[in-house]
């Protein structure tokens, strides 16, 4: 086990951390954590289901057969201040540039349903606590990947991903007129108490902190959802 460069924790069963290595490990953790999350955050899941059902016009369910939406937590523990090294690394673009393909690890579950849409998958982030100078998401919303690129993109080094994103094939597709591939990605600013979501295989990256402060924290509720037989089934 390696120590991360930054103070970072997750709360909940996380597909991209556990399910990719062993789906059994993921479900073992799910069975432990889901009751805890339900006990502590059932009010939050109720709001999430209500608001997203209204927004999407279709039922939205936090599915206990999978890991419930969980948390990304960046920053120091209570009563502790970050040192210069911690703050330096939080200001670096260390997070993976990726598309969300966690659903692939749960194919055996999707097979239980008659109609499953794995092209228009959904991902969301609810900002609960943000650093003093804000936080957000980098997005490359003009990059249109075919299925082969979706399947392979995440498993490259970030430098190689940047090279892929500068490929004229991706941006000379009519989605953006005269886009300059050397420009920075678009930046989506988060607001505490508000949610950002997208549908589809959007290329994105957690944006690094800006002028990080010793007591900064970045806490977000994270989740994904797949449409199964007319219901959005949400998981982490």
PLM segments and residue spans:
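Intrinsically disordered, low-complexity, charge-biased terminal/linker regions in eukaryotic proteins
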Residues: 1-18
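Alpha-helical transmembrane segments of integral membrane proteins
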Residues: 179, 196-198, 229
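A short hydrophobic beta-strand segment most commonly corresponding to one strand
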Residues: 122-126, 213-231
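Signature of the catalytic double-stranded beta-helix
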Residues: 14-91, 108-117
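Short beta-strand His + acidic residue motifs that chelate non-heme Fe in jelly-roll/DSBH
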Residues: 186, 203-212
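Conserved metal-binding segment of the jelly-roll/cupin
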Residues: 188-204
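Catalytic core of non-heme Fe(II) oxygenases with the double-stranded beta-helix
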Residues: 80-189, 233
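A short beta-strand motif that forms part of the nucleic acid-binding face
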Residues: 141-144, 210, 225
């Amino acid at each position: 086990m390696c120590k991360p460069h930054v103070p970072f924790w997750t709360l909940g069963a996380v597909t991209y951390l556990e399910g990719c290595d062993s789906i059994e490990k993921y479900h073992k953790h799910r069975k432990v954590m889901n009751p805890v999350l339900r006990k502590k955050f059932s009010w939050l899941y109720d709001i999430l289901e209500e608001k997203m059902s209204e927004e999407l016009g279709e039922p939205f369910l936090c599915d206990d057969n999978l890991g419930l939406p969980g948390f990304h937590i960046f920053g120091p523990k209570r009563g502790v201040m970050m040192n210069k090294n911690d703050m330096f690394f939080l200001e670096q673009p260390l997070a993976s540039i990726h598309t969300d393909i966690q659903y692939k690890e749960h194919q055996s579950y999707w097979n239980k349903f008659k109609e499953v849409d794995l092209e228009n998958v959904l991902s969301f982030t609810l900002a609960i606590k943000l650093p003093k100078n804000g936080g957000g998401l980098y997005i490359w919303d003009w990059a249109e990947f075919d299925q082969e690129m979706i399947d392979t993109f995440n498993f490259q080094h970030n430098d190689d991903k940047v090279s892929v994103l500068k490929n004229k094939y991706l941006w000379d597709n009519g989605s953006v007129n005269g886009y300059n591939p050397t420009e920075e990605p678009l930046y989506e600013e988060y607001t505490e108490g508000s949610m950002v979501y997208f549908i589809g295989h959007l290329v994105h990256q957690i944006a690094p902190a800006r002028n990080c402060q010793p007591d900064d924290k970045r806490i977000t509720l994270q989740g994904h959802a797949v449409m199964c037989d007319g219901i959005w089934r949400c998981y982490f």
